[in-house]
Amino acid sequence: MVSPRGVCFLLFLLLGSVFGSVFMLGPLLPLMLLSPSRYRWITDRIVATWLTLPVALLELVLGVKVVVTGDGFIPGERSVIIMNHRTRLDWMFLWCCLLRYSYLRQEKICLKAALKSVPGFGWAMQVASFIFIQRRWEDDRTHMSNMLQYFCRIREPVQLLLFPEGTDLTENTRARSDEFAEKNGLQKYEYVLHPRTTGFTFIVDTLRGGDNLDAVHDITVAYPQNIPQTERHLLAGVFPREIHFHVQRFTVASVPAGAAGLQAWCQERWREKERRLQRFYETVPRRFDAPAVGVCVREPCCQSGQCVCVPRCKSEGRVRIILVASLLYWSVFITAACASLCLCPPAQFYFLFMVVFFLCQQRFTGGLELMELACHRYWSRRSADKQE
């Protein structure tokens, strides 16, 4: 069953991503050829404006409540974020947390390569230099290394989101996780899947080796009511009433070095998640049992009336201003873009040209993030030749 509010939510995001990619990001593509680092600095901030749109729709229009407990983020720090993958949409819901406690412009996501082909969303993700993986380590290792080393060389302060479980929690994926646990003599999990640690250990070691990592944030996400497992649930109007995030921050010095140590460390985090989520879903009302940290600037955020919150880099008033401004801006921008396509032939030609470009470049070059890497390598060689 299709819900009007679900259709409006997804349509608004789709139009924003398509028009934003064409009219906001498209004119900046030539800068990538001249200065990849400046191109990255500017496009990160433009993409971040769109990332506020889903947050604005979820919180202001749909009334979703966000609860964050545990440790805080240090604004501007470079980190790897690991999170349990309860639904296919956790990455989008996380923006509600990062908007308050970090900077959306820093976020990169490690996600499956198929999403690169989605019109609008995939184009913007390519411009944002998200890391697309094929889920074949022999193929992904080289690409991941190139992307991470690029971020290190241009001193890009990224916060890279990774789902070590590799897929969202469903009955089928839980059954496969249980089968893996039986074969390896491990505990069976009910609320999480056993993590795959190869990518995590490689990312942490690479960023640490490139002096581009300050911390690892372990985030546990939970939904007390209404769990939208897939995009189809959003289309049917199923949105969470509350989204709970529990954040644990580990300094890079406290995280083990080497594959074996990192593997054991990550597995221990998942054992903790299982226990934490079990307590969460057995508690009435459902909430993470965490002490208050810092000063709360919001009203009580849980049904129990207890206010548990973490230090933030933005006050709740500032967050509301950002969300209202985002909703107004994107409403006007989408309306203006539609009007220009109806009334302005040059805009129609430009739009058609950019759509064809986005589709063709992926077919022939593999994606804009790969073009950006190639441009960086070219200018690096030019600089090295001049120094010689």
Curated annotation (Swiss-Prot):
It catalyses: a 1-acyl-sn-glycero-3-phosphate + an acyl-CoA = a 1,2-diacyl-sn-glycero-3-phosphate + CoA; a 1-acyl-sn-glycero-3-phospho-(1D-myo-inositol) + an acyl-CoA = a 1,2-diacyl-sn-glycero-3-phospho-(1D-myo-inositol) + CoA; 1-acyl-sn-glycero-3-phospho-(1'-sn-glycerol) + an acyl-CoA = a 1,2-diacyl-sn-glycero-3-phospho-(1'-sn-glycerol) + CoA; 1-hexadecanoyl-sn-glycero-3-phosphate + (9Z)-octadecenoyl-CoA = 1-hexadecanoyl-2-(9Z-octadecenoyl)-sn-glycero-3-phosphate + CoA. A motif (HXXXXD motif) lies at residues 85-90. It is found in: Endoplasmic reticulum membrane. Belongs to the 1-acyl-sn-glycerol-3-phosphate acyltransferase family. Exhibits acyl-CoA:lysocardiolipin acyltransferase (ALCAT) activity; catalyzes the reacylation of lyso-cardiolipin to cardiolipin (CL), a key step in CL remodeling. Recognizes both monolysocardiolipin and dilysocardiolipin as substrates with a preference for linoleoyl-CoA and oleoyl-CoA as acyl donors. PANTHER family: 1-ACYLGLYCEROL-3-PHOSPHATE ACYLTRANSFERASE-RELATED, LYSOCARDIOLIPIN ACYLTRANSFERASE 1. This is Lysocardiolipin acyltransferase 1. It comes from Danio rerio.
